[in-house]
Amino acid sequence: MYLTDEELPFGIDDIVFLLNLEIRHKNAVSWDCDCPFCGKKGKLNVNLQKGVYRCNRCGEAGGKIGLYASVYHLDNGTACEQIKEYLGKNSQAPAYQVYKKEIESKKEVVNARRAPDLVLHQTYSELLTMLTLSETHKKKLLERGFSEEEIRKNGYKSTPVFGFRSLTERLIKAGCTVEGVPGFYQEEDGTWSLRFKRSCAGFLIPVRSIEGFIVGMQIRLDRPFDHTKYIWLSSVNDNMGAGSGSPVHFVGNPEDEIVFMTEGPLKGDLSHFLSGRSFACVPGVNQYANLPDVILKLKRSGVKLIYETYDMDKLLNTACQADYDEACVSCEFRKEKGKHQCLKKIEKRKHIQGGCKKLYGICRELLVACKQFVWDLDAEGMWAGNLKGVDDWLYDLKGKTPDQADEDR
């Protein structure tokens, strides 16, 4: 009678010990170890809760017995007996030869030159007319604070789940150019298609330039992964595809004397709707490659002052309170709250402040005034921990209580 993985008297962490795998990164759920199959450092993800492993480079995967058995080329029964023997002696298993598994080299991808903004706008605008917004996504946008009219005006649409080729064919027949438009690519048979994945389902957020052209698309994922909620519609890894270019989103009047700078187009759209103010939105606080050109355009159109309104993590209290993320479970300081500084919080605050400093530096070089904008402060002038984004603060000013389901904003 064979035991199931759950009934075995050892865990996958014991196998990691026996094989003497070097752990490069760990948290309460999983470890990233050196792969014994291809030798790549830190690519073998070992899930402690599920008792499984997978190499993100060579693709080797399986359960805890399979990990040991595959390394020593044994059947599962023999592997199980050896595992129990070595664990009983509290000793590691014999040395083994790391098999340098060859990874099939991919063909070099040839990208198309990114199309001009006007072409992007025409193609994306036509694409949006062919798509719909699901009731689920509409409800989420309403819960965030948008009105139905604003949702319609901004052009949010749900990602399609099939018919990518036919959508592309319809666009081409409508006179649209797809070559050089991020998201579109050419398949091996020469047919053009659209790069949507089921694992990246969500709703599309049009990203607009100062001139009002749709120059990119972000996707708000239904199921975020690796702490990622937003991704670009891109085909940079596909034949004749194109990268997003990470453009800066603008909403409002570029001739306003005051413009607010924040992170994320959806946050900017909502903040503009709630306040009536103009917002420029970088894709991420440290994604500033396109920022100088945007600020220069704003300066030429009459902008006198830019307010930095990045998230209030920039004033995050870094004292350890065992409340930050799953890493707190394994932190040695968790039982001594308030006595130590949280390294994770320090890293997060440093990341946000780095983006702030870069914005200040660009504005200084271009001779545009820039000031920090803050809210939700405690008595010590640090973030009180309630209203993280400028959209949260503006929503709160409206006298509404955000729905619990809106914690993912």
Where are these regions (language model features)?
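Conserved active-site segments centered on acidic
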Residues: 78-136, 140
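Residue-level preference for well-ordered alpha-helical positions
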Residues: 16, 69, 84, 142-143, ...
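Phosphate-handling DNA/RNA-contact segment within nucleic-acid enzymes
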Residues: 164-302, 318-320
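Terminal peptide-recognition signature
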Residues: 35, 55, 68, 141, ...
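N-terminal structured subdomain of primase-like DNA metabolism proteins
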Residues: 1-104, 160-163, 168
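TOPRIM fold recognition
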Residues: 1-10, 54-59, 256-259, 267-409
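Short, well-structured beta-strand/strand-turn elements
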Residues: 24-25, 144-158, 276-287, 373
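Tandem CBS (Cystathionine beta-synthase) repeat/Bateman regulatory domains
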Residues: 131-176
